[in-house]
């Protein structure tokens, strides 16, 4: 603490300049100053380059000639030179300024390959060997050195020496002969039998091989250049085609927008008319409501009296409730007091328990400290014993050395004893010779005594040697015990080491497998994400297409609200007959071509309205292959229908020609514009797509005044329609291949626009021949059966049902999607119930069609007979009533459709939830695997620690127990944190999924609001 306070005081005393100088001096002393400068310069350059990269500033454009490869090679040469020479500052500035990265620096082999130096050449080898040997010099220095040596070797020679002596010759011929002789001597002598032709053939072969190699190289170069040219031309062609396609698409979009604007204007006018009618109805309802208000006021007076009585009863009940609530409050207060007492008790118990745990912890820690102290004392004692054993070993070594010395002394004593015995023999001989026996005996006795002493000393030394040898042979018991323990410990360590290596290898394999598996799972997750994104984009596109089709169909329904009267003829068309059955054809039907034209126009339009269902069928995510198959089947069906229509049109044309001669009224009818419009809409589905022009031709045709001219126009128009039908069928036969999605959507929109224009191009009567009718009459006369009338919708729905039955081979998901589409389209089907109600009301559905023919013929004959106008007014009233019923039914159908759409959205939500659940499962499995890997690593660390503890012979069960408890606590904390992470990830995923579902639901509601 004192040192820290001193440091703070010193820092407070120092000024900024002094601190700066001190820092500078410390950096300079440590040798960090240069590196800091280079780092700061590098960072400054990067910061200055950053606004250039973001687009704020424009860098100076330096005109550099040559390719980027050569620039990179030269930059890498300079960088290598700066690095080898140790110019760190200039290198740190050069890297960011040149835009060169450390990973992108060319190697020496790359540079040599770029300079096109042959790897087999001596220059290449010398450069490579020189770079390996001379690490200090760079590639640039070595290369320049080699170039200098190469040019020095090729210097011109000023002095020459002549080795061969030339003799003076007089003539030039002799000199040439001498040169030929020298060449003949120098040239190697070949076999005499070898001819000149063989040599020439060899030269020819060599030259041909060289020419072939050169030709092959030239051909390769020519092929590469030609292929590049072809690719460039193909790119230019594709770009031109793209621009053409974009221009056509823009024109089509402009035409569509204009048509939509016209439709919007017409719908606004109808809405204004509808609002005026509604205001009148509201006024009548208001008067009725005023009468009802008077009645209600009387009832209110009665109700007030009842309410007063009820209020009195209610006050009594409130007083009872108040008393009950007061009792409940008292009970709640008592319960709160009980809870507070219990909470206090719990807190006290928890405090006691915590104190006990702390005491236990302190006791355990004290025990552990004592155990550690005892272990240390034992270790000190063991060390002392080891020191004593070592000292005993040293004593043993000393005793062994002493035994060896004693053995040497014994050998010397033996030699002395032998010498003494010899001396004794010599002395005995002398004694025999000499006469002094007494002196000799005394000397003998002394020598014997000395011998005995020496023998005793020898025996004692031998005994000591034996005892010492026994002690050396038998080691100490403590040493034996320690040796046994050491052997056991070494064996255990070897076994544990082998087990550890096996476990480590197995865990390493598991880790690699898990890593590979996790990589695969990540790739699958990325694939799932990409598929989900693509599916969401497809769903959004398909919803937009659905919205457009709904708006178009509803606009057509609003444009032409009148129902068709001829129900039996359309039922015959639904069953597959082009012309009504023979039993249902009456004389009026045959004599009135206007009715026949209406029937054929409806039949053609009903066949056309089948096509936009491709959008609805393509609403499933995996519907590309199905759509291809459906389009092929649809093309075949359209070809068959085109053939049937050709036959039907021919038969109809013959009947019209026959009936025109019989009935004079048929000539007065207006031209068959409905039929022509229907046929033109059919021909508009050909690949040329001449929709707009043909519709305009129909809408802008001048009406002819005379009857003969009208008949000619009818015949000409019907003939042109038949020829166009043939052209459309032929083009359809050719275009059997399926179109892409963009073309499908465009074609379906073009169909809808063509149908809408056919309604706009309805005929108006000629002012010269016929009088102008009343507004109600004109409405009825102009409300000829439209393209999207209910019987034709029945035809479309019947065909869709048959197609769905044919498509039963597909998956259940697609079946559900098709069912939803059928339910969505069934809202339009019930619009065809009005003709059936009319039949039930007054028309006979049996064989004679006279009433139906009369009702249909009333449209053109209304200009001549005033009695028919009254019938039309009555029919109008009936139709208005039926319209009101239809509005109610439509509302019910809209509710059903909304419920169906909600079901579809719920299914989509379920699918999204399934996808998110799968994603969560994958993430959880990955997290579990990561946990397992962490646990395995912890186990490895534990095993290492245990081995270390065993090797140190200081195992303590309490320490192990405490370590295990700490590890368990760490694992629990890690598990809790991972669980929290998983929960947060799941919450984020659920929020994302809910947002996506809400966006989908919002999109669907917006679609519904826009559609109505």
Swiss-Prot record:
Impact upon substituting residue 307 to D: In JBTS10; uncertain significance
Q: Where is this region: Mediates homooligomerization?
A: 609-665
Spans of biased composition, class Low complexity? 720-737
Q: Which GO terms describe its biological process?
A: axoneme assembly; cilium assembly; embryonic body morphogenesis; epithelial cilium movement involved in determination of left/right asymmetry; negative regulation of fibroblast growth factor receptor signaling pathway involved in neural plate anterior/posterior pattern formation
Q: Which InterPro entries match?
A: LisH, OFD1
Residues modified to Phosphoserine: 663, 669, 686, 720, 735, 745, 774, 789, 811
Record has Iron as a keyword? no
Annotated stretches, region: Disordered: 719-744, 757-794, 824-904, 963-1012
Q: Where is the composition biased (Basic and acidic residues)?
A: 871-904, 973-982
According to the record, mutating residue 97 to G results in: Increased protein stability
Where, by residue number, does the polypeptide cross the bilayer? none
Q: What Pfam families does the record tag this protein with?
A: LisH_2
The role this protein plays is: Component of the centrioles controlling mother and daughter centrioles length. Recruits to the centriole IFT88 and centriole distal appendage-specific proteins including CEP164. Involved in the biogenesis of the cilium, a centriole-associated function. The cilium is a cell surface projection found in many vertebrate cells required to transduce signals important for development and tissue homeostasis. Plays an important role in development by regulating Wnt signaling and the specification of the left-right axis.
Recorded disease is:
Orofaciodigital syndrome 1: A form of orofaciodigital syndrome, a group of heterogeneous disorders characterized by abnormalities in the oral cavity, face, and digits and associated phenotypic abnormalities that lead to the delineation of various subtypes. OFD1 is X-linked dominant syndrome, lethal in males. Craniofacial findings consist of facial asymmetry, hypertelorism, median cleft, or pseudocleft of the upper lip, hypoplasia of the alae nasi, oral clefts and abnormal frenulea, tongue anomalies (clefting, cysts, hamartoma), and anomalous dentition involving missing or extra teeth. Simpson-Golabi-Behmel syndrome 2: A severe variant of Simpson-Golabi-Behmel syndrome, a condition characterized by pre- and postnatal overgrowth (gigantism), facial dysmorphism and a variety of inconstant visceral and skeletal malformations.
- Write the protein's name: Centriole and centriolar satellite protein OFD1
Q: What is the lineage of its organism?
A: Eukaryota, Metazoa, Chordata, Craniata, Vertebrata
């Amino acid at each position: 603490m004192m040192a820290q306070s001193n440091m703070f005081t010193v820092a407070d005393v120092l000024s900024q300049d002094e601190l700066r100088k001190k820092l500078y001096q410390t950096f300079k002393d440590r040798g960090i100053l240069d590196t800091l400068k280079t780092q700061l310069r590098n960072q400054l350059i990067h910061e200055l380059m950053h606004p250039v990269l973001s687009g704020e500033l424009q860098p100076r454009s330096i005109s550099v000639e040559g390719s980027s490869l050569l620039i990179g090679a030269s930059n890498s040469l300079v960088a290598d030179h700066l690095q080898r020479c140790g110019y760190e500052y200039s290198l740190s500035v050069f890297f960011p300024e040149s835009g060169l990265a450390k990973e992108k620096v060319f190697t020496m082999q790359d540079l040599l390959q770029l300079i096109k130096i042959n790897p087999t050449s001596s220059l290449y080898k010398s450069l490579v060997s020189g770079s390996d040997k001379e690490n200090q010099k760079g590639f640039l220095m070595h290369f320049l050195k080699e170039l200098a040596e190469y040019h020095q070797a090729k210097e011109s020679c000023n002095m020459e020496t002549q080795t061969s002596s030339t003799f003076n010759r007089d003539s030039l011929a002799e000199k040439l002969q001498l040169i030929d002789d020298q060449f003949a001597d120098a040239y190697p002598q070949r076999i005499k039998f070898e001819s000149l032709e063989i040599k020439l053939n060899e030269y020819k072969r060599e030259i041909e091989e060289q020419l072939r190699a050169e030709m092959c190289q030239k051909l390769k170069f020519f092929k590469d250049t030609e292929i590049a040219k072809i690719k460039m031309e193909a790119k230019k062609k594709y770009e031109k085609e793209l621009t053409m396609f974009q221009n056509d698409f823009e024109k089509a979009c402009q035409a569509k927008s204009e048509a939509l604007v016209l439709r919007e204007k017409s719908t606004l006018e109808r809405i204004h008319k509808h609002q005026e009618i509604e205001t009148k109805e509201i006024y009548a309802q208001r008067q009725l409501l005023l009468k009802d208000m008077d009645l209600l006021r009387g009832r209110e007076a009665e109700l007030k009296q009842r309410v007063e009585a009820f209020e009195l009863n209610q006050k009594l009940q409130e007083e009872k409730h108040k008393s009950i609530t007061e009792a409940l409050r008292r009970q709640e207060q008592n319960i709160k007091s009980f809870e507070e007492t219990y909470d206090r008790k719990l807190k006290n118990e928890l405090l006691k328990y915590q104190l006990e745990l702390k005491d236990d912890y302190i006791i355990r820690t004290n025990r552990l400290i004592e155990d550690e102290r005892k272990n240390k004392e034992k270790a000190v004692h063991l060390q002392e014993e080891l020191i004593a054993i070592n000292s005993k070993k040293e004593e043993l070594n000393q005793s062994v050395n002493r035994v060896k010395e004693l053995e040497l002394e014994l050998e010397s004593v033996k030699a002395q004893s032998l010498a003494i015995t010899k001396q004794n023999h010599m002395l005995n001989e002398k004694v025999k010779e000499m006469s002094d026996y007494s002196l000799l005996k005394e000397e003998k006795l002394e020598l014997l005594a000395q011998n005995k002493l020496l023998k005793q000393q020898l025996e004692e030394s031998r005994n000591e040697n034996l005892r010492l040898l026994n002690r050396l042979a038998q080691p100490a018991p403590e040493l034996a015990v320690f040796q046994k323990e050491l052997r056991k410990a070494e064996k255990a360590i070897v076994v544990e080491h082998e087990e550890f290596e096996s476990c480590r290898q197995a865990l390493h394999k598991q880790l690699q497998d898990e890593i590979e598996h996790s990589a695969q799972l990540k790739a699958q997750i990325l694939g799932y994400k990409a598929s989900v994104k693509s599916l969401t984009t497809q769903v959004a596109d398909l919803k937009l297409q659905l919205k457009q089709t709904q708006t178009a169909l509803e606009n057509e329904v609003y444009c032409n609200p009148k129902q068709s009267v001829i129900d039996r003829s359309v039922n015959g068309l639904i069953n597959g007959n082009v012309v009504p059955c023979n039993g249902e054809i009456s004389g009026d039907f045959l004599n009135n071509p206007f009715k026949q034209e209406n029937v054929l126009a409806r039949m053609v339009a009903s066949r056309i309205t089948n096509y936009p269902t491709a959008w609805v069928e393509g609403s499933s995510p995996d519907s590309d292959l199905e759509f291809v198959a459906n389009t092929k089947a649809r093309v075949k069906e359209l070809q068959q229908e085109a053939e049937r229509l050709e036959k039907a049109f021919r038969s109809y044309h013959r009947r019209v020609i026959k009936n025109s001669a019989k009935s004079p009224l048929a000539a007065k009818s207006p031209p068959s514009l409905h039929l022509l419009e229907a046929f033109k809409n059919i021909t508009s589905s050909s690949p040329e797509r001449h929709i707009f022009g043909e519709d305009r031709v129909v809408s802008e045709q001048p009406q002819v005044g005379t009857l003969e001219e009208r008949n000619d126009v009818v015949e000409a128009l019907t003939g042109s329609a038949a020829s166009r039908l043939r052209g459309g069928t032929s083009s359809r036969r050719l275009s059997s291949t399926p179109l892409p999605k963009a073309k499908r959507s465009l074609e379906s929109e073009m169909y809808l626009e063509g149908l809408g224009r056919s309604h706009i191009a309805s005929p108006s009567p000629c002012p010269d021949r016929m009088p102008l009718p009343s507004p109600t009459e004109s409405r009825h006369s102009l409300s000829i059966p439209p393209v999207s009338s209910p019987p034709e919708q029945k035809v479309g729905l019947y065909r869709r049902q048959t197609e769905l039955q044919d498509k039963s081979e597909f998956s259940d998901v697609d079946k559900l999607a098709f069912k939803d589409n059928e339910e969505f389209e069934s809202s339009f089907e019930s619009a065809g119930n009005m003709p059936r109600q009319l039949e039930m009301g007054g028309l006979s559905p049996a064989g004679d069609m006279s009433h139906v023919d009369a009702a249909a013929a009333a449209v053109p004959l209304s200009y001549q007979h005033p009695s028919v106008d009254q019938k039309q007014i009555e029919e109008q009233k009936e139709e208005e009533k039926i319209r009101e019923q239809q509005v109610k039914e439509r509302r019910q159908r809209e509710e059903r459709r909304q419920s169906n759409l909600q079901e579809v959205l719920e299914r989509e939500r379920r699918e999204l939830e399934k996808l998110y659940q799968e994603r969560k499962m994958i993430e959880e499995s990955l997290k579990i695997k990561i946990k397992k890997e962490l646990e395995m690593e912890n186990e490895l660390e534990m095993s290492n620690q245990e081995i270390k503890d065993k090797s140190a012979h200081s195992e303590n069960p309490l320490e192990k127990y405490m370590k295990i408890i700490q590890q368990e606590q760490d694992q629990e904390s890690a598990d809790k944190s991972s669980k929290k992470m998983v929960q947060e990830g799941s919450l984020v995923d659920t929020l994302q999924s809910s947002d996506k579902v809400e966006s989908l639901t919002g999109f669907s509601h917006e679609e519904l609001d826009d559609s109505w």
